[in-house]
Protein backbone atom coordinates (compact mmCIF):
# COMPACT_ATOMS: atom_id res chain seq x y z
CA UNK A 1 0.00 0.00 0.00
CA UNK A 2 1.67 3.22 -1.18
CA UNK A 3 0.09 5.33 1.55
CA UNK A 4 1.28 3.00 4.32
CA UNK A 5 4.82 2.84 2.91
CA UNK A 6 5.01 6.63 2.71
CA UNK A 7 3.78 6.92 6.30
CA UNK A 8 6.39 4.43 7.55
CA UNK A 9 9.11 6.25 5.65
CA UNK A 10 7.99 9.53 7.20
CA UNK A 11 8.09 7.99 10.71
CA UNK A 12 11.59 6.62 10.11
CA UNK A 13 12.80 9.99 8.86
CA UNK A 14 11.38 11.82 11.89
CA UNK A 15 12.84 9.23 14.26
CA UNK A 16 16.27 9.44 12.69
CA UNK A 17 16.19 13.23 12.88
CA UNK A 18 15.81 13.11 16.68
CA UNK A 19 17.87 9.99 17.37
CA UNK A 20 21.58 9.98 17.99
CA UNK A 21 23.94 9.64 15.03
CA UNK A 22 24.89 6.00 14.71
CA UNK A 23 28.51 6.63 15.70
CA UNK A 24 27.45 8.57 18.81
CA UNK A 25 25.07 5.78 19.81
CA UNK A 26 27.93 3.30 19.41
CA UNK A 27 30.30 5.42 21.51
CA UNK A 28 27.75 5.88 24.29
CA UNK A 29 26.93 2.16 24.41
CA UNK A 30 30.60 1.17 24.27
CA UNK A 31 31.58 3.64 27.01
CA UNK A 32 28.72 2.96 29.42
CA UNK A 33 29.25 -0.80 29.20
CA UNK A 34 33.02 -0.49 29.49
CA UNK A 35 32.83 1.85 32.48
CA UNK A 36 30.92 -0.81 34.43
CA UNK A 37 33.72 -3.34 33.90
CA UNK A 38 36.40 -0.81 34.84
CA UNK A 39 34.42 -0.12 38.01
CA UNK A 40 34.15 -3.83 38.78
CA UNK A 41 37.90 -4.46 38.52
CA UNK A 42 38.95 -1.24 40.22
CA UNK A 43 36.27 -1.70 42.87
CA UNK A 44 37.82 -4.99 43.92
CA UNK A 45 41.17 -3.27 44.40
CA UNK A 46 39.49 -0.38 46.17
CA UNK A 47 38.04 -2.56 48.94
CA UNK A 48 41.10 -4.85 49.26
CA UNK A 49 42.94 -2.67 51.82
CA UNK A 50 40.04 -3.13 54.23
CA UNK A 51 38.88 -6.71 53.65
CA UNK A 52 41.66 -8.30 51.60
CA UNK A 53 41.43 -10.06 48.24
CA UNK A 54 39.78 -13.41 48.83
CA UNK A 55 37.33 -15.68 47.07
CA UNK A 56 34.61 -13.97 49.10
CA UNK A 57 35.59 -10.45 48.04
CA UNK A 58 35.83 -11.50 44.39
CA UNK A 59 32.45 -13.21 44.66
CA UNK A 60 30.83 -10.20 46.32
CA UNK A 61 32.09 -7.67 43.79
CA UNK A 62 31.28 -9.83 40.75
CA UNK A 63 27.89 -10.78 42.17
CA UNK A 64 26.88 -7.21 42.95
CA UNK A 65 28.14 -6.02 39.56
CA UNK A 66 26.08 -8.63 37.72
CA UNK A 67 23.03 -7.80 39.84
CA UNK A 68 23.47 -4.10 39.12
CA UNK A 69 23.83 -4.75 35.38
CA UNK A 70 20.64 -6.84 35.38
CA UNK A 71 18.61 -4.36 37.41
CA UNK A 72 19.93 -1.38 35.47
CA UNK A 73 19.20 -2.91 32.06
CA UNK A 74 15.72 -3.96 33.16
CA UNK A 75 14.85 -0.56 34.60
CA UNK A 76 16.45 1.27 31.66
CA UNK A 77 14.30 -0.65 29.21
CA UNK A 78 11.16 -0.08 31.26
CA UNK A 79 11.81 3.66 31.57
CA UNK A 80 12.55 3.92 27.85
CA UNK A 81 9.03 2.67 27.11
CA UNK A 82 7.46 5.21 29.46
CA UNK A 83 9.65 8.28 29.01
CA UNK A 84 11.42 9.85 26.06
CA UNK A 85 14.95 8.34 26.26
CA UNK A 86 16.40 11.63 25.05
CA UNK A 87 15.51 13.15 28.40
CA UNK A 88 17.35 10.47 30.40
CA UNK A 89 20.47 9.33 28.52
CA UNK A 90 22.63 12.37 29.30
CA UNK A 91 21.59 12.65 32.98
CA UNK A 92 22.19 8.92 33.49
CA UNK A 93 25.67 9.13 31.98
CA UNK A 94 26.55 12.13 34.13
CA UNK A 95 25.06 10.59 37.28
CA UNK A 96 26.77 7.25 36.67
CA UNK A 97 30.11 8.90 35.99
CA UNK A 98 29.80 11.16 39.03
CA UNK A 99 29.09 8.16 41.26
CA UNK A 100 32.05 6.23 39.82
CA UNK A 101 34.14 9.12 41.15
CA UNK A 102 32.20 9.30 44.41
CA UNK A 103 32.61 5.62 45.33
CA UNK A 104 36.31 6.28 45.97
CA UNK A 105 35.82 8.54 49.02
CA UNK A 106 32.71 6.60 50.08
CA UNK A 107 34.58 3.29 50.28
CA UNK A 108 37.61 4.85 51.94
CA UNK A 109 35.58 6.60 54.60
CA UNK A 110 33.44 3.50 55.19
CA UNK A 111 36.47 1.22 55.21
CA UNK A 112 38.25 3.35 57.79
CA UNK A 113 35.32 2.76 60.17
CA UNK A 114 35.39 -1.03 59.87
CA UNK A 115 37.23 -3.08 62.46
CA UNK A 116 37.33 -6.43 60.70
CA UNK A 117 37.15 -8.26 57.39
CA UNK A 118 34.08 -10.37 58.18
CA UNK A 119 31.47 -11.32 55.61
CA UNK A 120 29.26 -8.36 56.52
CA UNK A 121 32.07 -5.89 55.91
CA UNK A 122 32.91 -7.54 52.59
CA UNK A 123 29.32 -7.35 51.39
CA UNK A 124 28.89 -3.76 52.59
CA UNK A 125 32.00 -2.41 50.89
CA UNK A 126 31.37 -4.38 47.70
CA UNK A 127 27.85 -3.00 47.49
CA UNK A 128 29.02 0.58 48.09
CA UNK A 129 31.74 0.20 45.46
CA UNK A 130 29.69 -1.02 42.50
CA UNK A 131 25.92 -1.26 42.85
CA UNK A 132 24.49 2.22 42.22
CA UNK A 133 26.87 3.53 39.53
CA UNK A 134 26.84 0.18 37.71
CA UNK A 135 23.04 0.12 37.71
CA UNK A 136 22.78 3.68 36.38
CA UNK A 137 25.28 3.09 33.59
CA UNK A 138 23.66 -0.23 32.67
CA UNK A 139 20.37 1.59 32.13
CA UNK A 140 21.87 3.59 29.27
CA UNK A 141 22.25 0.94 26.49
CA UNK A 142 18.56 -0.11 26.39
CA UNK A 143 17.59 3.56 26.18
CA UNK A 144 19.98 4.09 23.29
CA UNK A 145 18.49 1.04 21.56
CA UNK A 146 14.96 2.41 21.96
CA UNK A 147 16.03 5.81 20.67
CA UNK A 148 17.73 4.37 17.59
CA UNK A 149 14.85 2.13 16.51
CA UNK A 150 13.24 3.61 13.42
CA UNK A 151 10.92 0.72 12.53
CA UNK A 152 10.19 -2.89 13.41
CA UNK A 153 11.96 -3.88 10.20
CA UNK A 154 15.27 -2.72 11.76
CA UNK A 155 14.80 -4.07 15.27
CA UNK A 156 17.04 -7.09 14.89
CA UNK A 157 19.95 -5.25 13.31
CA UNK A 158 19.81 -2.28 15.71
CA UNK A 159 19.50 -4.41 18.84
CA UNK A 160 22.15 -6.86 17.66
CA UNK A 161 24.60 -4.15 16.64
CA UNK A 162 24.32 -2.15 19.86
CA UNK A 163 24.33 -5.28 22.01
CA UNK A 164 27.54 -6.39 20.31
CA UNK A 165 29.10 -2.95 20.74
CA UNK A 166 28.23 -2.97 24.44
CA UNK A 167 29.80 -6.40 24.87
CA UNK A 168 32.91 -5.24 23.03
CA UNK A 169 33.08 -2.26 25.37
CA UNK A 170 33.06 -4.56 28.37
CA UNK A 171 35.70 -6.83 26.86
CA UNK A 172 37.96 -3.92 25.91
CA UNK A 173 37.61 -2.37 29.37
CA UNK A 174 38.42 -5.68 31.06
CA UNK A 175 41.67 -6.20 29.15
CA UNK A 176 42.63 -2.53 29.22
CA UNK A 177 42.15 -2.30 32.98
CA UNK A 178 43.70 -5.63 33.89
CA UNK A 179 46.76 -5.39 31.66
CA UNK A 180 47.46 -1.65 31.41
CA UNK A 181 45.57 0.69 33.71
CA UNK A 182 46.29 -1.23 36.92
CA UNK A 183 49.96 -1.48 35.96
CA UNK A 184 50.42 2.25 35.34
CA UNK A 185 47.82 4.10 37.42
CA UNK A 186 46.59 3.96 41.02
CA UNK A 187 43.03 2.84 41.67
CA UNK A 188 42.06 6.40 42.55
CA UNK A 189 43.29 7.66 39.18
CA UNK A 190 41.49 4.88 37.30
CA UNK A 191 38.16 5.59 39.00
CA UNK A 192 38.36 9.38 38.83
CA UNK A 193 39.51 9.27 35.22
CA UNK A 194 36.79 6.83 34.15
CA UNK A 195 34.13 8.78 36.00
CA UNK A 196 35.11 12.16 34.60
CA UNK A 197 35.35 10.86 31.03
CA UNK A 198 31.85 9.42 31.41
CA UNK A 199 30.58 12.73 32.81
CA UNK A 200 32.09 14.67 29.91
CA UNK A 201 30.56 12.31 27.36
CA UNK A 202 27.21 12.70 29.12
CA UNK A 203 27.46 16.49 28.91
CA UNK A 204 28.42 16.31 25.23
CA UNK A 205 25.50 13.99 24.47
CA UNK A 206 23.20 16.37 26.32
CA UNK A 207 24.37 19.31 24.20
CA UNK A 208 23.87 17.28 21.02
CA UNK A 209 20.35 16.21 22.00
CA UNK A 210 19.34 19.74 22.95
CA UNK A 211 20.40 20.95 19.54
CA UNK A 212 18.57 18.15 17.75
CA UNK A 213 15.36 18.64 19.76
CA UNK A 214 15.35 22.40 20.07
CA UNK A 215 16.10 22.26 23.80
CA UNK A 216 13.33 19.79 24.63
CA UNK A 217 15.69 17.02 25.77
CA UNK A 218 19.25 16.49 26.97
CA UNK A 219 19.25 18.75 30.02
CA UNK A 220 21.69 17.75 32.76
CA UNK A 221 20.76 18.89 36.28
CA UNK A 222 23.56 21.08 37.71
CA UNK A 223 23.45 19.02 40.92
CA UNK A 224 24.90 16.05 39.04
CA UNK A 225 27.84 18.13 37.85
CA UNK A 226 28.38 19.33 41.41
CA UNK A 227 28.37 15.69 42.55
CA UNK A 228 31.15 14.88 40.10
CA UNK A 229 33.15 17.89 41.27
CA UNK A 230 32.60 17.09 44.95
CA UNK A 231 33.53 13.44 44.42
CA UNK A 232 36.77 14.45 42.71
CA UNK A 233 37.69 16.79 45.56
CA UNK A 234 36.81 14.24 48.24
CA UNK A 235 38.87 11.61 46.43
CA UNK A 236 42.00 13.62 47.22
CA UNK A 237 41.23 14.02 50.93
CA UNK A 238 39.69 10.62 51.68
CA UNK A 239 41.91 8.55 54.00
CA UNK A 240 44.02 5.92 52.25
CA UNK A 241 45.99 3.11 53.86
CA UNK A 242 48.31 2.73 50.87
CA UNK A 243 51.77 4.12 50.40
CA UNK A 244 51.81 2.30 47.09
CA UNK A 245 49.25 0.40 45.07
CA UNK A 246 51.09 -2.55 43.59
CA UNK A 247 49.78 -4.95 40.98
CA UNK A 248 48.36 -7.12 43.77
CA UNK A 249 48.25 -5.16 47.02
CA UNK A 250 47.73 -1.95 48.89
CA UNK A 251 51.19 -1.77 50.44
CA UNK A 252 52.85 0.32 53.10
CA UNK A 253 55.88 0.21 55.36
CA UNK A 254 55.34 1.09 59.01
CA UNK A 255 58.11 1.97 61.46
CA UNK A 256 58.24 0.04 64.74
CA UNK A 257 57.84 2.63 67.53
CA UNK A 258 59.68 0.34 69.94
CA UNK A 259 62.67 -0.39 67.69
CA UNK A 260 64.29 2.42 65.73
CA UNK A 261 65.48 0.20 62.90
CA UNK A 262 62.42 -2.03 62.78
CA UNK A 263 60.07 -1.87 59.80
CA UNK A 264 56.84 -3.75 59.09
CA UNK A 265 55.63 -4.46 55.56
CA UNK A 266 51.83 -4.34 55.54
CA UNK A 267 49.98 -5.74 52.53
CA UNK A 268 46.27 -4.96 52.45
CA UNK A 269 45.09 -5.71 55.99
CA UNK A 270 47.94 -7.94 57.20
CA UNK A 271 51.46 -7.54 58.62
CA UNK A 272 53.46 -9.65 56.19
CA UNK A 273 57.09 -9.08 57.11
CA UNK A 274 59.27 -7.52 59.78
CA UNK A 275 62.73 -6.30 58.83
CA UNK A 276 65.39 -4.84 61.09
CA UNK A 277 67.36 -2.54 58.82
CA UNK A 278 70.47 -2.78 61.01
CA UNK A 279 70.32 -6.39 62.20
CA UNK A 280 69.14 -9.08 59.75
CA UNK A 281 69.45 -11.71 62.49
CA UNK A 282 66.64 -10.09 64.48
CA UNK A 283 63.47 -12.08 63.78
CA UNK A 284 60.29 -10.57 65.16
CA UNK A 285 57.62 -12.96 63.89
CA UNK A 286 57.36 -16.33 65.58
CA UNK A 287 56.83 -18.29 62.38
CA UNK A 288 60.05 -16.85 60.91
CA UNK A 289 61.91 -17.92 64.05
CA UNK A 290 60.39 -21.39 63.64
CA UNK A 291 61.64 -21.63 60.05
CA UNK A 292 65.04 -20.39 61.22
CA UNK A 293 65.00 -23.15 63.85
CA UNK A 294 64.44 -25.72 61.10
CA UNK A 295 67.48 -24.44 59.21
CA UNK A 296 69.52 -24.45 62.44
CA UNK A 297 68.59 -28.07 63.12
CA UNK A 298 68.89 -29.54 59.63
CA UNK A 299 72.29 -28.14 58.58
CA UNK A 300 75.54 -27.61 60.49
CA UNK A 301 75.95 -24.12 61.94
CA UNK A 302 77.41 -21.64 59.49
CA UNK A 303 77.23 -24.00 56.52
CA UNK A 304 76.05 -22.19 53.39
CA UNK A 305 72.86 -23.40 51.77
CA UNK A 306 71.26 -23.27 48.36
CA UNK A 307 67.77 -21.96 49.12
CA UNK A 308 64.68 -21.26 47.04
CA UNK A 309 62.11 -18.92 48.58
CA UNK A 310 58.55 -19.07 47.21
CA UNK A 311 57.21 -15.65 48.10
CA UNK A 312 59.39 -12.72 49.03
CA UNK A 313 57.56 -10.30 51.28
CA UNK A 314 60.27 -8.34 53.04
CA UNK A 315 62.91 -11.01 52.28
CA UNK A 316 63.52 -11.44 56.02
CA UNK A 317 64.65 -15.07 55.92
CA UNK A 318 67.00 -14.73 52.92
CA UNK A 319 68.77 -11.87 54.71
CA UNK A 320 68.96 -13.94 57.89
CA UNK A 321 70.53 -16.87 56.04
CA UNK A 322 73.02 -14.56 54.35
CA UNK A 323 74.05 -13.22 57.76
CA UNK A 324 74.31 -16.48 59.74
CA UNK A 325 75.40 -18.68 56.83
CA UNK A 326 77.81 -16.64 54.70
CA UNK A 327 78.00 -17.92 51.17
CA UNK A 328 74.36 -19.01 51.09
CA UNK A 329 72.76 -18.65 47.68
CA UNK A 330 69.10 -17.62 47.88
CA UNK A 331 66.71 -17.14 45.00
CA UNK A 332 63.52 -15.31 45.97
CA UNK A 333 60.53 -15.69 43.65
CA UNK A 334 58.02 -12.89 44.28
CA UNK A 335 54.97 -12.38 42.07
CA UNK A 336 54.47 -8.69 42.90
CA UNK A 337 57.02 -6.28 41.36
CA UNK A 338 55.67 -3.47 43.54
CA UNK A 339 56.60 -5.38 46.69
CA UNK A 340 60.12 -5.95 45.35
CA UNK A 341 60.42 -2.23 44.62
CA UNK A 342 59.36 -1.37 48.19
CA UNK A 343 61.88 -3.89 49.52
CA UNK A 344 64.64 -2.11 47.64
CA UNK A 345 63.56 1.45 48.35
CA UNK A 346 62.28 1.26 51.93
CA UNK A 347 63.48 -2.02 53.43
CA UNK A 348 67.11 -1.85 52.35
CA UNK A 349 67.13 -4.96 50.17
CA UNK A 350 70.39 -5.17 48.26
CA UNK A 351 70.63 -7.92 45.69
CA UNK A 352 73.95 -9.73 45.38
CA UNK A 353 75.25 -12.90 43.79
CA UNK A 354 74.09 -14.68 46.94
CA UNK A 355 70.63 -13.10 47.12
CA UNK A 356 68.71 -12.77 43.89
CA UNK A 357 65.08 -11.79 43.33
CA UNK A 358 62.99 -12.95 40.40
CA UNK A 359 59.55 -11.49 39.68
CA UNK A 360 57.36 -14.42 38.69
CA UNK A 361 54.59 -16.68 39.87
CA UNK A 362 56.12 -19.14 42.32
CA UNK A 363 54.51 -22.17 40.63
CA UNK A 364 56.00 -21.13 37.30
CA UNK A 365 59.35 -20.55 38.98
CA UNK A 366 59.22 -24.00 40.56
CA UNK A 367 58.66 -25.56 37.17
CA UNK A 368 61.79 -23.87 35.84
CA UNK A 369 64.06 -24.98 38.69
CA UNK A 370 66.77 -27.51 37.83
CA UNK A 371 66.49 -30.83 39.63
CA UNK A 372 68.37 -31.74 42.78
CA UNK A 373 70.14 -28.45 43.51
CA UNK A 374 68.33 -26.89 46.49
CA UNK A 375 69.11 -27.72 50.10
CA UNK A 376 66.06 -25.77 51.21
CA UNK A 377 62.76 -24.72 49.66
CA UNK A 378 60.77 -22.22 51.73
CA UNK A 379 57.06 -21.70 51.07
CA UNK A 380 56.15 -18.26 52.39
CA UNK A 381 53.48 -17.16 49.94
CA UNK A 382 50.43 -18.13 52.01
CA UNK A 383 48.44 -15.31 53.59
CA UNK A 384 45.87 -15.26 56.33
CA UNK A 385 43.00 -14.28 54.05
CA UNK A 386 43.83 -16.03 50.81
CA UNK A 387 46.02 -18.86 49.58
CA UNK A 388 47.67 -19.29 46.17
CA UNK A 389 46.10 -22.69 45.66
CA UNK A 390 48.51 -23.62 42.86
CA UNK A 391 51.27 -23.94 45.48
CA UNK A 392 49.33 -26.28 47.75
CA UNK A 393 48.81 -29.32 45.52
CA UNK A 394 50.53 -32.65 45.05
CA UNK A 395 51.81 -31.48 41.68
CA UNK A 396 53.33 -28.31 43.17
CA UNK A 397 54.97 -30.23 46.00
CA UNK A 398 56.37 -32.73 43.52
CA UNK A 399 58.07 -29.81 41.77
CA UNK A 400 59.48 -28.65 45.11
CA UNK A 401 60.69 -32.19 45.82
CA UNK A 402 62.34 -32.34 42.40
CA UNK A 403 64.23 -29.11 43.10
CA UNK A 404 65.61 -30.46 46.41
CA UNK A 405 68.74 -32.49 46.96
CA UNK A 406 68.28 -36.03 48.28
CA UNK A 407 68.36 -34.81 51.88
CA UNK A 408 66.88 -31.37 51.20
CA UNK A 409 64.05 -29.93 53.29
CA UNK A 410 60.80 -28.27 52.30
CA UNK A 411 59.45 -25.89 54.96
CA UNK A 412 56.38 -23.66 54.71
CA UNK A 413 54.41 -21.17 56.74
CA UNK A 414 50.64 -21.76 56.82
CA UNK A 415 47.89 -19.69 58.44
CA UNK A 416 44.55 -21.12 59.49
CA UNK A 417 42.06 -21.10 62.36
CA UNK A 418 39.81 -23.79 63.86
CA UNK A 419 38.70 -26.21 62.56
CA UNK A 420 42.08 -25.94 60.75
CA UNK A 421 40.84 -27.83 57.70
CA UNK A 422 43.33 -26.16 55.37
CA UNK A 423 46.35 -27.05 57.53
CA UNK A 424 45.12 -30.64 57.83
CA UNK A 425 44.62 -30.92 54.07
CA UNK A 426 48.04 -29.48 53.31
CA UNK A 427 49.66 -31.92 55.72
CA UNK A 428 47.82 -34.79 54.03
CA UNK A 429 49.08 -33.50 50.69
CA UNK A 430 52.65 -33.26 51.95
CA UNK A 431 52.45 -36.87 53.16
CA UNK A 432 51.41 -37.95 49.66
CA UNK A 433 54.75 -36.63 48.34
CA UNK A 434 57.22 -36.85 51.24
CA UNK A 435 57.66 -39.85 53.57
CA UNK A 436 58.82 -37.66 56.46
CA UNK A 437 56.54 -34.81 57.54
CA UNK A 438 56.20 -32.80 60.77
CA UNK A 439 54.16 -29.89 62.08
CA UNK A 440 55.48 -27.11 64.32
CA UNK A 441 52.81 -25.24 66.25
CA UNK A 442 51.75 -24.09 69.72
CA UNK A 443 49.97 -26.65 71.91
CA UNK A 444 46.62 -24.87 71.55
CA UNK A 445 46.79 -25.20 67.77
CA UNK A 446 47.70 -28.88 67.95
CA UNK A 447 44.71 -29.35 70.23
CA UNK A 448 42.47 -27.64 67.66
CA UNK A 449 41.60 -24.85 70.09
CA UNK A 450 43.44 -21.96 68.45
CA UNK A 451 44.85 -20.87 65.13
CA UNK A 452 47.34 -18.58 63.48
CA UNK A 453 50.71 -19.33 61.93
CA UNK A 454 52.09 -22.86 61.87
CA UNK A 455 55.13 -24.29 60.11
CA UNK A 456 55.25 -27.58 58.22
CA UNK A 457 58.41 -29.37 57.15
CA UNK A 458 59.01 -32.37 54.94
CA UNK A 459 61.84 -34.36 53.41
CA UNK A 460 62.64 -37.61 51.64
CA UNK A 461 65.04 -38.38 54.50
CA UNK A 462 64.30 -38.68 58.21
CA UNK A 463 64.09 -35.33 60.00
CA UNK A 464 66.12 -34.50 63.15
CA UNK A 465 63.00 -33.71 65.14
CA UNK A 466 64.70 -33.65 68.54
CA UNK A 467 67.17 -31.12 67.20
CA UNK A 468 64.29 -29.11 65.73
CA UNK A 469 62.59 -29.04 69.13
CA UNK A 470 65.79 -27.83 70.78
CA UNK A 471 66.26 -25.18 68.08
CA UNK A 472 62.71 -23.94 68.68
CA UNK A 473 63.55 -23.42 72.34
CA UNK A 474 66.75 -21.63 71.35
CA UNK A 475 64.58 -19.25 69.33
CA UNK A 476 62.49 -18.52 72.47
CA UNK A 477 59.50 -20.45 71.16
CA UNK A 478 57.24 -22.76 73.14
CA UNK A 479 56.05 -24.45 69.95
CA UNK A 480 55.81 -28.22 69.81
CA UNK A 481 56.85 -30.74 67.16
CA UNK A 482 54.07 -33.07 66.00
CA UNK A 483 54.91 -36.20 64.03
CA UNK A 484 54.03 -39.89 63.94
CA UNK A 485 50.84 -40.85 65.76
CA UNK A 486 50.23 -37.34 67.03
CA UNK A 487 50.33 -36.02 63.48
CA UNK A 488 48.12 -38.91 62.31
CA UNK A 489 45.49 -37.89 64.84
CA UNK A 490 45.74 -34.24 63.84
CA UNK A 491 45.45 -34.85 60.09
CA UNK A 492 42.67 -37.44 60.36
CA UNK A 493 40.97 -38.15 57.04
CA UNK A 494 41.78 -34.77 55.47
CA UNK A 495 41.68 -34.73 51.69
CA UNK A 496 44.76 -34.57 49.49
CA UNK A 497 44.88 -31.43 47.33
CA UNK A 498 45.51 -31.79 43.60
CA UNK A 499 45.58 -29.45 40.63
CA UNK A 500 42.22 -30.91 39.67
CA UNK A 501 40.65 -30.27 43.07
CA UNK A 502 42.08 -27.84 45.61
CA UNK A 503 39.21 -26.03 47.38
CA UNK A 504 41.56 -24.07 49.63
CA UNK A 505 39.28 -21.04 49.94
CA UNK A 506 36.56 -23.27 51.37
CA UNK A 507 38.98 -25.13 53.65
CA UNK A 508 40.66 -21.99 54.99
CA UNK A 509 39.21 -20.30 58.07
CA UNK A 510 40.76 -16.83 57.84
CA UNK A 511 39.42 -15.42 61.11
CA UNK A 512 39.40 -16.55 64.69
CA UNK A 513 35.92 -17.29 66.00
CA UNK A 514 34.45 -14.50 68.17
CA UNK A 515 35.53 -14.88 71.77
CA UNK A 516 38.32 -17.29 70.92
Give the positions of each predicted feature.
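Alpha-helical transmembrane segments of multi-pass membrane proteins
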Residues: 1-244, 255-259, 269-272, 303-304, ...
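Short, contiguous strand/loop micro-motifs
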Residues: 30-31, 278, 384-387, 413-414
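Short gly/ser-rich anion-binding loops that grip negatively charged ligand groups
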Residues: 88, 134, 277, 281, ...
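The AdoMet/dcAdoMet-binding core of the Class I SAM-like
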Residues: 94, 282, 289-409, 418-422, ...
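Phosphate/oxyanion-binding active-site loops and adjacent basic polyanion-contact surfaces
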Residues: 137-140, 283-287
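Composition- and surface-driven signal marking solvent-exposed, interaction-prone regions
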Residues: 195, 392, 425-426, 469-472
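Soluble small-group transferase modules, centered on the S-adenosyl donor enzyme superfamily
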Residues: 215-274, 280-284, 297, 441-516
Amino acid sequence: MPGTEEALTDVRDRTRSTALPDWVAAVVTFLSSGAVLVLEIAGLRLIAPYVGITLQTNTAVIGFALAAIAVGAWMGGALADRTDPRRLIAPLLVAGGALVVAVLPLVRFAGSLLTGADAGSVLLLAAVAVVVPAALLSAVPPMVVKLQLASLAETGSVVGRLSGIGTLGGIAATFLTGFLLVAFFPTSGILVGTGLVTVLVGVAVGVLLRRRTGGVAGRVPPALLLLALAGSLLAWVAPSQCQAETAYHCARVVADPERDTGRVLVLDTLRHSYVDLADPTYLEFEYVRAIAAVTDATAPAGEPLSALHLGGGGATLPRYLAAVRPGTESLVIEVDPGVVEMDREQLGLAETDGLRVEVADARVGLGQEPAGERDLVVGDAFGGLSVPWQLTTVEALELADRALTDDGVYVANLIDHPPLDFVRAELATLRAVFPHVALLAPDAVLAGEDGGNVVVLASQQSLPLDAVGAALRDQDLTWQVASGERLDAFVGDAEVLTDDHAPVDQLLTPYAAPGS
